[in-house]
């Protein structure tokens, strides 16, 4: 699924929580969530993607909301994430309540936009 959505090598995301959305027994979207390595009681929205043929149906927003709900059940206070040159993902995050911020210690590329949500 990752290779279909992204033209980059997959990091080892063997920890945290993962969701996969299916349509007719075919995986069409995925998303991850794990604890932040920088902040306590904070989660990180890890890699997420939607198959090109399954886009424009709100799957990414649904997967963002599922991860927000899981973070709340875990008792986390914040969620953070980043996007790189991806206005669709940025807009979906904004629609789900995330706001842009500048972390003291950026963790992604120079082109990244950083997002956080107070839970």
Predicted regions and their residues:
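Conserved GNAT acetyl-CoA-binding A-motif
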Residues: 71-84
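Conserved active-site alpha-helix within GNAT-family acetyltransferase domains
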Residues: 84-103, 107-110
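Short beta-strand-to-coil "C-cap" segments at the C-terminal boundary of structured domains/repeats
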Residues: 116-119
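Acetyl-CoA-dependent GNAT
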Residues: 1-41, 46, 51
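A short linear hydrophobic-aromatic micro-motif
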Residues: 32, 80, 101-102
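Residues that line or immediately flank small-molecule/substrate-binding pockets and catalytic motifs
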Residues: 35, 52, 83, 105
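Short hydrophobic/aromatic beta-strand or adjacent loop that forms the aromatic wall/cage
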Residues: 16, 110-114
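Conserved acetyl-CoA-binding loop-helix of GNAT-fold acetyltransferases
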Residues: 50, 56-69, 95
């Amino acid at each position: 699924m990752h290779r279909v959505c992204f033209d980059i090598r997959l990091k080892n995301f063997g920890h945290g929580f993962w969701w996969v959305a299916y349509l007719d027994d075919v995986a069409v979207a995925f998303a991850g969530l794990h604890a932040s390595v920088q902040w306590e009681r904070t989660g990180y929205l890890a890699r997420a993607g939607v198959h090109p043929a399954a886009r424009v149906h709100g799957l990414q927003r649904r997967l963002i909301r599922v991860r927000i709900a899981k973070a709340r059940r875990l008792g986390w206070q914040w969620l953070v994430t980043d996007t790189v040159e991806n206005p669709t993902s940025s807009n979906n995050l904004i629609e789900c309540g995330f706001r842009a911020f500048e972390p003291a210690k950026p963790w992604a590329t120079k082109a990244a936009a950083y997002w956080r949500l107070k839970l």
